Protein backbone atom coordinates (compact mmCIF):
# COMPACT_ATOMS: atom_id res chain seq x y z
CA UNK A 1 0.00 0.00 0.00
CA UNK A 2 1.44 3.40 -1.00
CA UNK A 3 1.57 6.50 1.13
CA UNK A 4 -0.97 8.13 -1.16
CA UNK A 5 -3.37 5.26 -0.70
CA UNK A 6 -2.97 5.46 3.07
CA UNK A 7 -3.56 9.22 3.06
CA UNK A 8 -6.64 8.89 0.84
CA UNK A 9 -8.07 6.28 3.17
CA UNK A 10 -7.30 8.42 6.17
CA UNK A 11 -8.60 11.51 4.49
CA UNK A 12 -11.85 9.76 3.61
CA UNK A 13 -12.85 8.99 7.20
CA UNK A 14 -13.69 12.53 8.25
CA UNK A 15 -15.92 12.88 5.20
CA UNK A 16 -17.91 9.79 6.08
CA UNK A 17 -18.18 10.96 9.70
CA UNK A 18 -19.56 14.30 8.57
CA UNK A 19 -22.10 12.57 6.33
CA UNK A 20 -23.07 10.15 9.11
CA UNK A 21 -23.48 12.97 11.58
CA UNK A 22 -25.60 14.88 9.09
CA UNK A 23 -27.77 11.82 8.52
CA UNK A 24 -28.23 11.29 12.25
CA UNK A 25 -29.11 14.94 12.69
CA UNK A 26 -31.68 14.67 9.89
CA UNK A 27 -33.24 11.54 11.40
CA UNK A 28 -33.28 13.10 14.87
CA UNK A 29 -34.93 16.24 13.55
CA UNK A 30 -37.49 14.12 11.72
CA UNK A 31 -38.27 12.15 14.87
CA UNK A 32 -38.62 15.32 16.89
CA UNK A 33 -40.92 16.73 14.22
CA UNK A 34 -43.00 13.54 14.22
CA UNK A 35 -43.15 13.60 18.02
CA UNK A 36 -44.25 17.22 17.98
CA UNK A 37 -46.85 16.43 15.35
CA UNK A 38 -48.02 13.48 17.42
CA UNK A 39 -48.33 15.64 20.52
CA UNK A 40 -50.24 18.24 18.55
CA UNK A 41 -52.54 15.55 17.13
CA UNK A 42 -53.24 14.15 20.61
CA UNK A 43 -53.87 17.63 21.95
CA UNK A 44 -56.24 18.34 19.07
CA UNK A 45 -58.07 15.06 19.71
CA UNK A 46 -58.35 15.92 23.41
CA UNK A 47 -59.81 19.33 22.52
CA UNK A 48 -62.32 17.75 20.13
CA UNK A 49 -63.28 15.15 22.73
CA UNK A 50 -63.71 17.83 25.39
CA UNK A 51 -65.84 19.95 23.07
CA UNK A 52 -68.04 16.94 22.34
CA UNK A 53 -68.51 16.07 26.02
CA UNK A 54 -68.71 19.55 27.50
CA UNK A 55 -72.08 21.13 28.25
CA UNK A 56 -71.46 24.46 29.99
CA UNK A 57 -75.23 24.94 30.31
CA UNK A 58 -75.63 21.85 32.51
CA UNK A 59 -77.02 22.66 35.98
CA UNK A 60 -73.78 21.96 37.87
CA UNK A 61 -71.05 22.63 35.30
CA UNK A 62 -70.02 25.84 37.06
CA UNK A 63 -69.48 23.93 40.31
CA UNK A 64 -66.66 21.84 38.82
CA UNK A 65 -62.95 22.65 39.20
CA UNK A 66 -61.54 24.54 36.20
CA UNK A 67 -59.32 21.66 35.07
CA UNK A 68 -62.30 19.30 34.97
CA UNK A 69 -64.32 21.86 33.02
CA UNK A 70 -61.48 22.12 30.51
CA UNK A 71 -61.10 18.40 29.85
CA UNK A 72 -64.86 17.75 30.29
CA UNK A 73 -64.18 14.21 31.48
CA UNK A 74 -63.51 12.31 34.67
CA UNK A 75 -61.52 9.08 34.50
CA UNK A 76 -63.30 6.53 36.67
CA UNK A 77 -61.43 3.56 38.13
CA UNK A 78 -63.65 0.48 38.39
CA UNK A 79 -63.41 -3.32 38.66
CA UNK A 80 -65.83 -4.11 35.83
CA UNK A 81 -66.54 -7.70 36.84
CA UNK A 82 -69.33 -7.39 39.42
CA UNK A 83 -72.71 -7.98 37.80
CA UNK A 84 -75.04 -6.10 38.07
CA UNK A 85 -73.09 -3.20 39.61
CA UNK A 86 -70.61 -2.96 36.73
CA UNK A 87 -69.86 -5.49 34.00
CA UNK A 88 -69.22 -5.81 30.27
CA UNK A 89 -71.88 -6.87 27.80
CA UNK A 90 -71.20 -6.94 24.06
CA UNK A 91 -68.12 -4.81 24.62
CA UNK A 92 -70.03 -2.12 26.53
CA UNK A 93 -69.76 -1.26 30.21
CA UNK A 94 -73.16 -1.73 31.82
CA UNK A 95 -74.70 -1.86 35.25
CA UNK A 96 -75.87 0.23 38.17
CA UNK A 97 -72.70 2.31 38.49
CA UNK A 98 -72.30 3.12 34.77
CA UNK A 99 -75.98 4.11 34.52
CA UNK A 100 -75.78 6.33 37.59
CA UNK A 101 -72.48 7.79 36.34
CA UNK A 102 -74.13 8.73 33.04
CA UNK A 103 -76.93 10.50 34.92
CA UNK A 104 -74.40 12.27 37.17
CA UNK A 105 -72.34 13.32 34.16
CA UNK A 106 -75.41 14.80 32.51
CA UNK A 107 -76.00 17.10 35.48
CA UNK A 108 -72.31 18.06 35.60
CA UNK A 109 -72.09 18.62 31.84
CA UNK A 110 -69.17 16.21 31.36
CA UNK A 111 -68.48 12.54 30.64
CA UNK A 112 -67.52 9.94 33.25
CA UNK A 113 -65.26 7.43 31.48
CA UNK A 114 -64.88 3.96 33.04
CA UNK A 115 -61.44 2.28 33.16
CA UNK A 116 -61.18 -1.38 34.14
CA UNK A 117 -58.77 -2.37 36.93
CA UNK A 118 -58.61 -4.94 39.69
CA UNK A 119 -60.35 -3.72 42.81
CA UNK A 120 -57.23 -3.76 44.98
CA UNK A 121 -55.44 -1.30 42.65
CA UNK A 122 -58.11 1.39 42.63
CA UNK A 123 -56.93 3.32 45.69
CA UNK A 124 -53.38 3.34 44.34
CA UNK A 125 -54.71 4.55 40.99
CA UNK A 126 -56.36 7.50 42.72
CA UNK A 127 -53.15 8.28 44.57
CA UNK A 128 -51.10 8.23 41.34
CA UNK A 129 -53.78 10.33 39.56
CA UNK A 130 -54.41 7.60 37.00
CA UNK A 131 -58.07 7.98 37.93
CA UNK A 132 -59.94 11.07 39.05
CA UNK A 133 -62.48 9.08 41.05
CA UNK A 134 -63.35 5.45 41.76
CA UNK A 135 -66.85 3.98 41.43
CA UNK A 136 -66.85 0.24 41.93
CA UNK A 137 -69.30 -1.10 44.54
CA UNK A 138 -66.80 0.29 47.05
CA UNK A 139 -67.96 0.23 50.64
CA UNK A 140 -67.37 3.50 52.49
CA UNK A 141 -65.23 2.65 55.53
CA UNK A 142 -63.26 4.70 58.04
CA UNK A 143 -60.08 2.86 57.05
CA UNK A 144 -60.45 3.89 53.41
CA UNK A 145 -61.31 7.44 54.41
CA UNK A 146 -58.10 7.61 56.44
CA UNK A 147 -55.86 5.71 54.02
CA UNK A 148 -55.35 2.74 56.33
CA UNK A 149 -54.79 -0.83 55.16
CA UNK A 150 -57.54 -2.75 56.97
CA UNK A 151 -55.43 -5.93 56.98
CA UNK A 152 -52.25 -4.50 58.51
CA UNK A 153 -53.63 -1.42 60.24
CA UNK A 154 -50.86 0.66 58.65
CA UNK A 155 -51.38 4.01 56.96
CA UNK A 156 -50.67 3.68 53.24
CA UNK A 157 -51.96 6.97 51.84
CA UNK A 158 -53.90 10.15 52.43
CA UNK A 159 -57.21 8.36 52.03
CA UNK A 160 -60.31 9.46 50.19
CA UNK A 161 -63.64 11.16 50.71
CA UNK A 162 -66.74 9.19 49.82
CA UNK A 163 -69.95 10.46 48.26
CA UNK A 164 -72.39 7.78 49.42
CA UNK A 165 -75.00 6.81 46.84
CA UNK A 166 -76.33 3.34 47.75
CA UNK A 167 -76.96 1.44 50.97
CA UNK A 168 -76.20 -2.24 50.50
CA UNK A 169 -76.55 -5.20 52.83
CA UNK A 170 -76.52 -8.98 52.67
CA UNK A 171 -79.52 -10.96 51.39
CA UNK A 172 -80.74 -14.57 51.35
CA UNK A 173 -82.39 -16.33 48.43
CA UNK A 174 -83.67 -19.84 47.78
CA UNK A 175 -84.99 -21.90 44.89
CA UNK A 176 -88.29 -20.43 43.77
CA UNK A 177 -91.16 -22.21 45.48
CA UNK A 178 -88.77 -24.32 47.57
CA UNK A 179 -87.89 -22.21 50.58
CA UNK A 180 -87.49 -25.23 52.90
CA UNK A 181 -89.14 -23.13 55.62
CA UNK A 182 -86.47 -20.43 55.39
CA UNK A 183 -87.79 -16.92 55.98
CA UNK A 184 -84.65 -15.31 57.39
CA UNK A 185 -81.37 -16.04 59.14
CA UNK A 186 -83.18 -17.25 62.28
CA UNK A 187 -84.53 -20.21 60.28
CA UNK A 188 -81.18 -21.14 58.71
CA UNK A 189 -80.03 -23.34 61.61
CA UNK A 190 -79.41 -26.86 60.33
CA UNK A 191 -79.72 -25.73 56.68
CA UNK A 192 -77.16 -25.77 53.87
CA UNK A 193 -75.92 -22.39 52.64
CA UNK A 194 -73.67 -21.40 49.73
CA UNK A 195 -71.62 -18.17 49.83
CA UNK A 196 -68.72 -16.55 48.04
CA UNK A 197 -65.53 -17.15 49.98
CA UNK A 198 -64.14 -14.27 52.05
CA UNK A 199 -67.17 -12.00 51.70
CA UNK A 200 -69.38 -10.26 54.25
CA UNK A 201 -71.93 -13.02 53.53
CA UNK A 202 -69.34 -15.64 54.49
CA UNK A 203 -68.50 -13.83 57.73
CA UNK A 204 -72.17 -13.34 58.58
CA UNK A 205 -72.95 -17.01 57.89
CA UNK A 206 -70.21 -18.12 60.31
CA UNK A 207 -71.50 -15.66 62.91
CA UNK A 208 -75.09 -16.90 62.54
CA UNK A 209 -73.97 -20.54 62.63
CA UNK A 210 -72.23 -19.94 65.96
CA UNK A 211 -75.44 -18.37 67.27
CA UNK A 212 -77.36 -21.49 66.22
CA UNK A 213 -74.99 -23.69 68.21
CA UNK A 214 -75.08 -21.36 71.22
CA UNK A 215 -78.86 -21.72 71.32
CA UNK A 216 -78.68 -25.52 71.17
CA UNK A 217 -79.59 -25.83 67.48
CA UNK A 218 -77.75 -27.40 64.57
CA UNK A 219 -75.13 -25.17 62.91
CA UNK A 220 -75.47 -23.88 59.37
CA UNK A 221 -73.67 -26.11 56.86
CA UNK A 222 -71.65 -23.53 54.92
CA UNK A 223 -70.22 -24.18 51.46
CA UNK A 224 -67.84 -21.45 50.25
CA UNK A 225 -67.16 -20.87 46.54
CA UNK A 226 -64.81 -18.64 44.55
CA UNK A 227 -67.67 -16.57 43.12
CA UNK A 228 -71.41 -16.05 43.34
CA UNK A 229 -72.07 -17.82 40.04
CA UNK A 230 -70.76 -21.09 41.48
CA UNK A 231 -72.88 -20.63 44.60
CA UNK A 232 -75.95 -19.99 42.45
CA UNK A 233 -75.30 -23.12 40.40
CA UNK A 234 -75.13 -25.14 43.62
CA UNK A 235 -78.53 -23.76 44.67
CA UNK A 236 -80.05 -24.24 41.23
CA UNK A 237 -79.14 -27.94 41.28
CA UNK A 238 -80.49 -28.44 44.80
CA UNK A 239 -77.14 -28.92 46.51
CA UNK A 240 -77.89 -26.25 49.12
CA UNK A 241 -81.01 -24.70 50.60
CA UNK A 242 -80.05 -21.05 50.14
CA UNK A 243 -77.41 -18.59 48.95
CA UNK A 244 -76.31 -15.36 50.63
CA UNK A 245 -74.88 -12.46 48.56
CA UNK A 246 -74.66 -8.67 48.53
CA UNK A 247 -78.18 -7.39 47.94
CA UNK A 248 -77.63 -6.10 44.36
CA UNK A 249 -76.12 -9.43 43.30
CA UNK A 250 -78.93 -11.38 44.96
CA UNK A 251 -81.66 -9.18 43.51
CA UNK A 252 -80.18 -9.40 40.01
CA UNK A 253 -79.93 -13.20 40.20
CA UNK A 254 -83.55 -13.44 41.35
CA UNK A 255 -84.66 -11.22 38.47
CA UNK A 256 -82.76 -12.76 35.55
CA UNK A 257 -81.81 -16.37 36.35
CA UNK A 258 -84.07 -18.73 34.43
CA UNK A 259 -86.16 -15.78 33.30
CA UNK A 260 -86.97 -15.03 36.93
CA UNK A 261 -88.09 -18.60 37.64
CA UNK A 262 -85.03 -20.00 39.43
CA UNK A 263 -84.79 -18.08 42.70
CA UNK A 264 -86.75 -16.01 45.20
CA UNK A 265 -85.63 -13.61 47.91
CA UNK A 266 -86.36 -14.52 51.53
CA UNK A 267 -85.78 -12.85 54.85
CA UNK A 268 -86.92 -9.28 54.29
CA UNK A 269 -84.51 -6.35 54.51
CA UNK A 270 -80.79 -7.01 53.92
CA UNK A 271 -78.51 -7.28 56.96
CA UNK A 272 -75.17 -5.59 57.64
CA UNK A 273 -76.17 -2.63 55.48
CA UNK A 274 -73.34 -0.22 54.63
CA UNK A 275 -72.96 2.56 52.05
CA UNK A 276 -71.35 2.24 48.65
CA UNK A 277 -69.47 5.46 47.93
CA UNK A 278 -67.86 7.29 45.02
CA UNK A 279 -64.24 7.73 46.12
CA UNK A 280 -62.66 11.17 45.60
CA UNK A 281 -59.03 11.89 46.58
CA UNK A 282 -58.49 14.00 49.68
CA UNK A 283 -57.94 17.64 48.83
CA UNK A 284 -60.46 17.59 45.97
CA UNK A 285 -63.32 19.11 47.98
CA UNK A 286 -64.68 21.15 45.07
CA UNK A 287 -64.95 18.06 42.88
CA UNK A 288 -66.37 16.02 45.76
CA UNK A 289 -69.05 18.61 46.49
CA UNK A 290 -69.99 18.92 42.81
CA UNK A 291 -70.45 15.15 42.59
CA UNK A 292 -72.53 15.17 45.78
CA UNK A 293 -74.76 17.90 44.33
CA UNK A 294 -75.12 15.88 41.11
CA UNK A 295 -76.19 12.74 42.99
CA UNK A 296 -78.72 14.82 44.93
CA UNK A 297 -80.09 16.23 41.68
CA UNK A 298 -80.28 12.77 40.09
CA UNK A 299 -82.32 11.62 43.10
CA UNK A 300 -84.55 14.69 42.94
CA UNK A 301 -85.34 14.32 39.23
CA UNK A 302 -86.04 10.57 39.66
CA UNK A 303 -83.36 9.39 37.23
CA UNK A 304 -81.95 7.60 40.28
CA UNK A 305 -85.20 5.71 40.86
CA UNK A 306 -85.24 4.67 37.21
CA UNK A 307 -81.75 3.15 37.42
CA UNK A 308 -82.51 1.25 40.62
CA UNK A 309 -85.78 -0.05 39.18
CA UNK A 310 -84.02 -1.16 35.99
CA UNK A 311 -81.57 -3.27 37.99
CA UNK A 312 -84.11 -4.41 40.58
CA UNK A 313 -82.29 -2.82 43.54
CA UNK A 314 -84.81 -0.24 44.73
CA UNK A 315 -84.28 -1.30 48.35
CA UNK A 316 -80.66 -0.11 48.13
CA UNK A 317 -81.66 3.49 47.44
CA UNK A 318 -80.80 6.40 49.72
CA UNK A 319 -82.84 9.51 50.47
CA UNK A 320 -79.93 11.58 51.75
CA UNK A 321 -76.50 11.84 50.13
CA UNK A 322 -73.79 11.82 52.78
CA UNK A 323 -70.08 12.51 52.74
CA UNK A 324 -68.10 9.81 54.57
CA UNK A 325 -71.17 8.21 56.10
CA UNK A 326 -69.50 4.81 56.51
CA UNK A 327 -68.14 3.40 59.73
Feature annotation, model-predicted:
Residues 32-36:
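C-terminal motif of bacterial Sec signal peptides marking the signal peptidase cleavage site
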Residues 38-41:
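Bacterial signal peptide processing site
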Residues 46-138:
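Extracytoplasmic small-molecule ligand-binding "clamshell" domains
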Residues 83, 93-106, 167-227, 242, ...:
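Bilobed "Venus flytrap"/periplasmic-binding protein-like clamshell domains
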Residues 111-186:
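Acidic, polar ligand-binding/catalytic clefts
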Residues 138-155, 206-207, 237, 241-272:
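A ligand-binding cleft/hinge motif common to bilobed small-molecule-binding domains
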Residues 164-174, 200-205, 255-311, 313-327:
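Periplasmic-binding protein-like
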Amino acid sequence: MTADTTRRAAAGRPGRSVKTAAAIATVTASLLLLSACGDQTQAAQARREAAKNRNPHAPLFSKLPKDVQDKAMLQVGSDITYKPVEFRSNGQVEGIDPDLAAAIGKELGIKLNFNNATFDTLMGGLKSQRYDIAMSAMTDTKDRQQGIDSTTGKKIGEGVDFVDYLNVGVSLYTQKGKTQGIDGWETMCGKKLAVQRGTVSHDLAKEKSSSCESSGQQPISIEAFDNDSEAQTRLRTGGVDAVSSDYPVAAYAVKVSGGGNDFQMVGGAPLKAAPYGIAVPKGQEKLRDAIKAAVELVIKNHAYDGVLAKWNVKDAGVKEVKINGGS
